[in-house]
């Protein structure tokens, strides 16, 4: 049975009050400084014989999957929201800087986009990614983009042209300069509209497979029992789950405890918590998501891949 979209309705007065409060908070916070990332990854030193992943902030994860470089939901500028061309962006400002800038990224082979929300598809980052070093830099035709159904049009403002929309349950093999990789679109419980009235857009998680290893990038999701079905694909070595923005958006964002449960349902060996400590998108305190996540795994702390923005995880043999 398909998960139904859980898009909040602005006809609901509670939703309007929450949105207004968070908007005011975003404006107030915009006057404050942006804290530095906890650590700075060094992808140049990563081995192509291993699986290495670094959390760059929010849902942006840089993965070296046996030599194939994958970037999830790249958002690497100080602010998200509606961009006024050549001027500024209207929307929430980062609380913590990204661990790497666009120009500090290594060669990217594949970009995974989970859904169309402004904190997951960021035009400014994608434009810079497709023209590394600025508008006069050479076009990067080798970057492959995998995205949810009915979101391809959002990339027309970039020079990224190798775009695949992947519906739930669909598997596709991709060839890169470093070899081949399989990606499966995973059903999640969320919503895909970028604005209020384009709710036809899809929303995905992704299972990535190469050399007998599997990584799950769950994107944004509320609690759902569908991840248990992934056990049929084989063991999952690393699962990346969002753990923030659950208060009051629990209908579309899992709590830390629910994220752990879904990772357990999927049979994940290690869990990487993301989507926290970056933007003010909800009411929970800044450190609450990671503290609750650690508490949920207090008997298995060795399964926590990382905790802070900029940390790097190397998958053990």
Where are these regions (language model features)?
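Di-metal (Zn2+ and/or Mg2+/Mn2+) metal-binding site signature of metallo-dependent hydrolases
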Residues: 97-133, 149, 154
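Metallo-beta-lactamase
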Residues: 1-107, 137-142, 147-217, 237-241, 291-317
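Active-site metal-binding loops of divalent metal-dependent hydrolases
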Residues: 74-76, 116, 186-190, 220-221, ...
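Cap/insert and terminal regions of metallo-dependent hydrolase folds
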Residues: 2-10, 143-146, 150-153, 223-309
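Divalent metal-coordination and catalytic microenvironments
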Residues: 63, 73, 115, 122, ...
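Short amphipathic alpha-helix with an adjacent loop that forms part of the alpha/beta core around
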Residues: 99-106, 172-178, 197, 228-233, ...
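Short, conserved loop/helix-junction motifs that constitute active-site signature segments
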Residues: 104-106, 127-141, 232-235, 262-267
């Amino acid at each position: 049975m398909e998960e139904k979209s859980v898009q909040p309705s602005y006809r609901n007065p509670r939703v309007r009050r929450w949105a207004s409060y968070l908007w005011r908070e975003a404006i107030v916070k915009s006057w404050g400084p942006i804290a530095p990332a906890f650590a700075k990854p060094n992808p140049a030193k990563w081995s192509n014989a291993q699986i290495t992943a670094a959390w760059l902030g929010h849902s942006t994860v840089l993965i070296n999957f046996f030599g194939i470089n994958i970037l999830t939901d790249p958002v690497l500028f100080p602010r998200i929201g509606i961009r006024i061309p050549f001027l500024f962006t209207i929307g929430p400002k980062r609380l913590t800087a990204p661990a790497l800038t666009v120009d500090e990224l290594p060669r990217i082979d594949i970009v995974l986009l989970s859904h169309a929300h402004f904190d997951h598809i960021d035009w400014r980052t994608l434009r810079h990614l497709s023209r590394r070093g600025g508008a006069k830099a050479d076009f990067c035709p080798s970057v492959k983009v995998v995205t949810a159904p009915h979101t391809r049009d959002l990339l027309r403002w970039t020079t990224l042209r190798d775009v695949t929309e992947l519906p739930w349950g669909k598997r596709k093999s991709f060839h890169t300069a470093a070899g081949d990789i399989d990606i499966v679109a995973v059903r999640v419980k969320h919503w895909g509209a970028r604005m209020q009235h384009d709710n036809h857009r899809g929303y995905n998680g992704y299972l990535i497979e190469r050399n007998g290893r599997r990584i799950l990038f769950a994107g944004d999701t509320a609690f759902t029992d569908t991840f248990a079905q992934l056990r049929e694909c084989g063991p999952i070595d690393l699962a990346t789950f969002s753990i923030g923005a659950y208060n009051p958006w629990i209908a579309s964002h899992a709590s830390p405890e629910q994220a752990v449960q879904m990772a357990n349902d999927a049979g994940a060996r290690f869990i990487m918590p993301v989507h926290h400590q970056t933007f003010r998108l909800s009411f929970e305190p800044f450190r609450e998501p990671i503290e609750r996540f650690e508490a949920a795994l207090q008997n298995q702390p060795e399964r926590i891949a990382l905790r802070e923005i900029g940390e790097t995880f190397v998958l053990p043999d």
